[in-house]
């Protein structure tokens, strides 16, 4: 999977050389507009592969032994990546409000996986309703956009750093080590969404917000490579590929 992402990222960058590449001081480089397009497509593709074939996606990263908990939470992580790609693709002025609707879709679309891990229907569909209402109220200006940023960020922090407490709070099944790790990846994706939208709310440009999100993503990739990959006999190359891609995209967005 990570090899495919690297190839696609390179191909996308070269697809429209007259717009994607420019010379500055003799240096040929990727511009911010194309970096955003590349990053959005890479995120969406990765999410689609994880959602449609979570077991196969794990195998692409060298994880060949996966129980139901790991597979279900890989699908949940994939749904979150697809949602993050949709937020990236949205008009920056409406991205935060739309993220409420996207979150509702995410929760409903991934319900078969999250229900299988023991999360109750009331929590899943209740959160979907809350997010949809917040999305509507944010777009109409009746609610501060920081409310949705907080929902994304706090839920992401809980799922990435406090999986045991999250499972206990909702009365879900205790996950396997891989299931817990994949829940962490789902959580980190929520954090990336919160970083992006928080930067937009603070008045940063889309390129700056995109860069900050990908810097965070690069750090999470390195974190997983050096703290979790060995637990599953997974090569470090996969998560570190995300670190390399993230660093490159962030550089392209911030250098102008």
List the predicted regions and their residue ranges:
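N-terminal chloroplast transit peptides
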Residues: 1-22
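Cytosolic juxtamembrane helix and N-cap/initiation of the first transmembrane helix
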Residues: 25-43, 68, 137-152
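Core segments of alpha-helical transmembrane spans in multipass integral membrane proteins
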Residues: 41-50, 68-93, 98-107, 154-155, ...
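Transmembrane alpha-helix/helix-exit interface in multi-pass inner-membrane proteins
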Residues: 44-59, 149-169
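Membrane-water interface at the C-terminal end of transmembrane alpha helices
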Residues: 49-50, 130-142, 245-256
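Interfacial loop at the N-terminal end of multi-pass membrane proteins
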Residues: 55-74, 164-183
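Hydrophobic cores of alpha-helical transmembrane segments in multi-pass inner/ER membrane proteins
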Residues: 80-86, 126-135, 190-195, 243-249
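Membrane-helix boundary connector in multi-pass membrane proteins
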Residues: 107-122, 220-237
